C-alpha cells in the first residue's frame, strides 16, 4: 500500500525548481485526502549577511518581505486550486538543518518535497547543495522534484 503523506514540507527560495516542488506538493496533498496539508518554509540564511560590513537589519527585512509576498501568492494559488490546509513560516539561520531536521520535527512532517538544486558543479563543491544535504540528513522521506506537473523535465531558465 502506498504511503498517504499527510504533512508535506516544501522549502521555497524563489527558484523555478521550488515552484515546481510546490505545485507537485499541492497535487499530492489533494490526492491524499482532506486532512493532508502543505507547509512551506523560506529560510533566510543569516550567515550570508555576516560578512557584509555595511550590514543592517533593513537587508534582512527586505529579504523577508520578498519571501512573504512569494509565500502569500503560493497560499492563494493552493487555496484557489482547492487545498485548504496550506500555510508557511519564515525561519532564520542555516537552511540545511532547518529544512532537514528542525521544521520536520516541530511540525510532524512526513514528506519533504524539494526542488532539484539550481547550483552548478563549482557552487556545489564550494558551498554544498541544500537539496543534497536534505536528502541525506532529513528525519522523514524526501522527494526531489525535477519535472513539472506533466512529468516533463523542467526547462533550463534563461540567463539574463
Predicted regions and their residues:
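Short beta->alpha linker loops
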Residues: 55, 90-94, 117
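Short, solvent-exposed amphipathic alpha-helices that sit
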Residues: 24, 63-74, 98
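Gly/Ser-rich helix-loop-strand patches that form or flank binding pockets
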Residues: 4, 104-153, 159
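General small-molecule cofactor/ligand-binding pocket signal
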Residues: 39-41, 87-91, 143
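Short, well-ordered secondary-structure micro-motifs
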Residues: 21, 50-53, 98-101, 124-126, ...
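Acidic, proline/glycine-rich short linear motifs
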Residues: 42-69, 152-160
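Structural beta-alpha unit
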Residues: 1-3, 76-112, 149-160
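Small/aliphatic-rich secondary-structure junction motif
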Residues: 2-53, 81, 160
